[in-house]
Amino acid sequence: MEYKYCENDNFEDFASGRVIYGGTSVPNFPVRLGNEIFRRCLIYKKGKDNLTVYDPCCGGGYLLTVLSMLNPCITEMVGSDIDDSMLQIAERNFSLLSQDGLAKRKQELKELAQKYGKQSHLDALNSLGNLKTLCRSGDFSYRTFHADCTKPIQESLHPDIIITDIPYGNLVSWEGAAESPLNLMYRQLAKMSHEDTILAVIMDKKQKPEANGWLRLEKQQLGKRKFEIYRCLNN
């Protein structure tokens, strides 16, 4: 993997479960790789500021949270998922972009440190101090909603960039359907997009989506996974 737009910095402050809420069933994603893919999407964008970024399989919102912390050009982040328990975690993670949300997390970590005296909680408090500079104020918003991205999405939404990591569990549950749910997802996402919408999908390397409504701009294999980047064909 050749990194063009994201330096090999120390991203330990963004580790899942440290400050950002995580868990055994909560998907995360390599920070540098996610940021590289997002910034490759930016290269193809005509407008590069005040962006609405959407993840239709957001899980606990880890990827969107990290991207919004690292990229001030994102002014609205939107996540949807079919699992309401994941959306609850995503809401908590999205709140970390606000002073109030980060203050609440700081209090939680302080209480854990006082109760258990673990170094990991002290390290998390130190990371929280580092992340505080990435908090947003003013024109920044976030929201989540319940949705099956293979079906019509009722929410009013016009994303500038869509980025999603298709969880392995989704691929397993989608097997055997009359029509590829992955293809259905591409079709539904195209309906809500405009001609300058860029889509990045990370998936199993064996997946071969038809991607109706999208023009592929690039693809790259990552071990057993791959990502593909597209521009919407709507006009």
What are these regions (language model features)?
Residues 1-235:
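Class I S-adenosyl-L-methionine-dependent methyltransferase catalytic core
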